[in-house]
Every structure is written in C-alpha cells, then in structure tokens.
Design a protein with these regions (language model features):
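Extended mixed-charge, aromatic/glycine-enriched low-complexity segments
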Residues: 1-189
C-alpha cells in the first residue's frame, strides 16, 4: 500500500547531498588524492545512495527493531524533549551494516578534506568542510523522511486493517498532486 507524500523535495535534496560529496571527491582527486581511493569512496557513496532509495525503507518496517537507525519508536523520539519521547520496550544493540557504511564513508570524506587542508588552502578547506556537513545533513534528513513516511504508512495500514464494514477512512491532503516519478525535482529554488 503506497500513499502519496511530499517525497520529491527530500529525495532531491538527499540526492544533491550525495552529488556534493562526489564533487568534493573529484576536487580531492585533482589535488592529489589517490585515484583508487577516490573511485572506491565514490562507489561506496553510490551504494549508500542506492541503499536509501531501495532497501532502507524495508529495514524500518519492524515495529520493534533492535537497530536504533531502523526502530521507528526510538528514531522518531526527540531526546531533548520528553513530550516527544516514547520509550522502547527493547534495547538497540544491533547495528545495521549499510547504515554504518553510510556514516563511515561520509566521515571518511570529511577526514580527507582535513588531510588536504594545505593543498586546498585554509579557506577552501573550511568551505569544503561546510559543504560536506550540509550535504551530510541533507542525506540524513532524507533518511529521516523515509523513516517518517514508513511510520505514517504503518499507522495508516493499522487503521485500514481495523475498519469495520460500515466505516470509511478518508485522507485529506491539500498538497497532493501528480508527480511523474522520472522527474522528481525540488519544488523550491
């Protein structure tokens, strides 16, 4: 059961985040970073993007996931505000290999920027680190949106599954529109 939601902005921003990281890798390669390392990191970035586009949502379907990155209850709770927290009845001791690979490759690129500060120059290195942090934020915001969308779909399925024969479930969403999947683009520029 797929429900319409404003995915195009988040997906486009997340894809831009990956593109920004790939551009930083290209810049580091021009400055002397090893070609093999650049290719390998670029491939890891592409695999991480594919993971978010395809598999991550399926990992978030479990109601009581032992992985903090997949547990809807834990991941959607606000650690800083008790009004927006829900306590899980299980621990989160499992780490997802794909989620860890994503975090590691982003940190590795940030570390490489720091290593090439002399070649980049202080101001360019600061700019690249700023770009990398913003790109990572876009990627994790996209990941969060996927998790929220799965949570929303889960609750909608629960409602639909419990409807009685004489009941109706209506979704009113004033922002719904037809979006061609091939042309997902940002709405704001």
């Amino acid at each position: 059961m797929g429900f319409c939601r404003g995915l195009e902005n988040n997906a486009a921003e997340g894809a831009d985040g990956f593109k920004d990281f790939l551009q930083i890798i290209d810049e580091l390669e021009r400055l002397g970073a090893e070609n093999d390392w650049c290719k390998e990191v670029g491939e890891r970035l592409r695999k991480s993007k594919l993971y978010l586009k395809t598999t991550y949502r399926n990992h978030c379907k479990e109601d009581d996931s032992k992985c903090a990155d997949h547990c809807r209850v834990f991941a959607l709770s606000d650690a800083g505000d008790t009004d927006f927290q829900k306590i899980c009845s299980h621990s989160h001791k499992v780490k997802c290999e794909d989620c860890e690979k994503l975090k590691n490759v982003l940190e590795e690129v940030k570390g490489a920027i720091s290593e090439y500060t002399m070649q980049l120059g202080m101001f360019q290195a600061e700019d690249d680190l700023y770009e990398a942090k913003n790109a990572a934020a876009k990627i994790f915001e996209w990941r969060g949106h996927i998790l929220r969308a799965e949570n929303q779909d889960w609750y909608k399925r629960q409602i639909v599954d419990t409807l009685k024969r004489d009941e109706t479930f209506i979704i009113v969403d004033w922002t719904m529109k037809f979006i061609a999947m091939k042309f997902w683009e940002k709405q704001v520029e």
